[in-house]
Amino acid sequence: MKIGFIGLGIMGRPMAKNLLKAGYDVTVDSHSPAAAAELEACGAKVADQPTIGSTCDLVLTMLPNAPQVKQVMLGANGVAAHMQLGSTFIDMTSLNPIASKEIAAELAARGIQMLDAPVSGGEPKAIDGTLSFMVGGEEE
């Protein structure tokens, strides 16, 4: 499975590192070149968002807010426009339910499944890989 990870901040960077440590094929994108370079040094590929959409089976985001998630996924040349039918998007941003449902509906219309999966535990739990996830989405 190829995983795309967008958002390498305080939480995203250690989460992506843990995926690499577990042996996953991870491609990253970040507005911070230093964060992307750090992950590349750990074995990640670095690519732009359209490439992540077209080459990854699963796309994960850990972004600050709903407008950024919408821009990354649904904006002009956003990730969703390049994702394959049947692929999955997991958003770990703490979105409000209305924004999450709007994004999920738009993605479902494109044949992409979305799971809303905010996390609890903060940076220490992200570093040691023991975050708690609260996951919501379609049952299938």
Model-derived features with residue positions:
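Short, flexible micro-motifs
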Residues: G7-M15, G78-A81, F89, P124-K125, ...
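Rossmann-fold NAD(P) dinucleotide-binding segment
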Residues: P50-A117
